[in-house]
């Protein structure tokens, strides 16, 4: 994929789904916009240049496919905009922070008024630094809250979001005495910190924390202490920070074998237990709780994307659509400060293909998530995702 690829039109065989997604964009700003900040100033009645930074040209396997998926989703969103003109220009970062910073500066020289992407945290930090003095905001696809702040906002689903939602649900359902099980890695430490922050917001009580070395041998070695702590701590729930590609399958198999299981203990997690779908077959995850974006709008996007491009979208491709949805909604106000920091953090938020979301003052985000369980190897929604932050009490 070459940088600055011109937009292409795509035929759609089912206009009802297009109308549905277009409707999302028409409603993308969930309420009145409160504007602030002096830069960047734009003419919202003319085409506005948006730079999309993708990891094309990288030596990392899969990055070119991810780059193409992000571009496809962004162009799908641009084609759905009504009353707003976006000149989308695509730049390849090669997955390299130095290259990302270079192309970000080039994008601003080319007229970009906001940057969508890049994917990886180190790239996003480099890009934010490169364009900060120019008053350009960056909507990165990362889910790492540590990189957020100043002119960098993260679009990805952060562990804080998932932990806050599932712990709030646990507290409301008399399962608020929680034991955490996490791995002894840098990523594991970040997840544990997110869960502890979320517990304060959710009113949950962390009664114990157990960790393990990130290996099958490490898990087996830690298992007796995990089981003993679960029994002695008064825990009503056990929250796993691991995902299906990590220790989750092993933990949820071995703990029940040691009489640590539902219904005495409610298993729950801060990762999406329906990804990949084979995870739903795991015996230990049946009746467990996890969070996911609004499945109705997500499935609508996946179907639309498949019709347009003949393939299932990458799991994070929808973030590119969400970014364009937010930008389009703000441009639709006609304000010359539509892409300023103050505009981005307006409290009512936006509607995207992952549900409602809003940017927070610290550069992180809040997303409306559903709480789900697994029954008979299928996802069952326990508490639907909110459709607006006002309705959800925010």
Language-model-derived ranges and their functions:
Residues 38, 69, 80, 84-146, ...:
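Beta-alpha junction/loop-to-helix N-cap segments that form part of ligand/metal-binding clefts
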Residues 1-15, 19-29:
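N-terminal secretory signal peptides
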Residues 309-324, 328-383, 393-394:
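Segments of small-molecule ligand-sensing domains
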Residues 156-211:
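An alpha-beta-alpha
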Residues 248-321, 334, 385, 389-392:
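Extracellular/periplasmic periplasmic-binding protein-like sensory domains
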Residues 31-34:
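Bacterial signal peptide processing site
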Residues 137-139, 146-168, 182, 282-294:
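Short beta-strand elements at the ligand-binding edges of bilobed clamshell
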């Amino acid at each position: 994929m070459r940088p600055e690829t011109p937009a292409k039109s795509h035929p759609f065989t089912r206009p009802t789904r297009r109308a549905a997604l277009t409707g999302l964009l028409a409603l993308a700003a969930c309420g009145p916009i409160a504007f602030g900040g002096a830069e960047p100033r734009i003419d919202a009645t003319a085409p506005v240049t948006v730079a999309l930074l993708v990891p094309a040209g990288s030596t990392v396997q899969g990055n070119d496919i991810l780059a193409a998926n992000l571009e496809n989703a962004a162009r799908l969103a641009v084609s759905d905009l009504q009353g707003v003109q976006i000149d989308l220009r695509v730049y390849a970062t090669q997955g390299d922070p130095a290259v990302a910073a270079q192309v970000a500066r080039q994008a601003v020289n080319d007229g970009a008024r906001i940057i969508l992407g890049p994917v990886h945290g180190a790239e996003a930090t480099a890009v934010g630094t490169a364009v900060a003095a120019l008053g350009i905001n960056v909507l990165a696809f990362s889910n790492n809250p540590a990189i957020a702040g100043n002119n960098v906002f993260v679009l990805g689903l952060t562990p804080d979001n998932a932990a806050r939602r599932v712990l709030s649900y646990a507290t409301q359902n008399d399962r608020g005495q929680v034991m955490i099980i996490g791995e002894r890695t840098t990523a594991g430490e970040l997840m544990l910190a997110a869960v502890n922050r979320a517990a304060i917001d959710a009113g949950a009580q962390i009664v114990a924390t157990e960790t393990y070395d990130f290996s099958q041998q490490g898990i087996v070695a830690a298992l007796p202490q995990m089981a003993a702590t679960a029994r002695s701590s008064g825990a009503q729930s056990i929250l796993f920070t691991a995902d299906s590609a990590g220790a989750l399958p092993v933990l949820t198999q071995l703990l029940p074998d040691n009489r640590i299981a539902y219904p005495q203990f409610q298993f729950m997690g801060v990762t999406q237990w329906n990804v990949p779908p084979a995870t739903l077959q795991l015996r230990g995850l049946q009746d467990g709780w996890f969070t996911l974006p609004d499945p109705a709008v997500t499935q609508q996007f996946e179907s639309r994307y498949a019709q347009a491009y003949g393939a299932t979208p990458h799991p994070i491709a929808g973030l590119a659509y969400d970014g364009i949805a937010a930008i389009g909604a703000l441009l639709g106000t006609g304000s010359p400060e539509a892409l300023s920091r103050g505009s981005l953090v307006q409290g009512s938020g936006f509607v995207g293909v992952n549900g409602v979301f809003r940017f927070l003052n610290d550069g992180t985000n809040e997303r409306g998530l559903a709480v789900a369980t697994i029954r008979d190897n299928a996802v069952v929604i326990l508490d639907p995702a909110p459709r607006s932050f006002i309705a959800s009490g925010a």
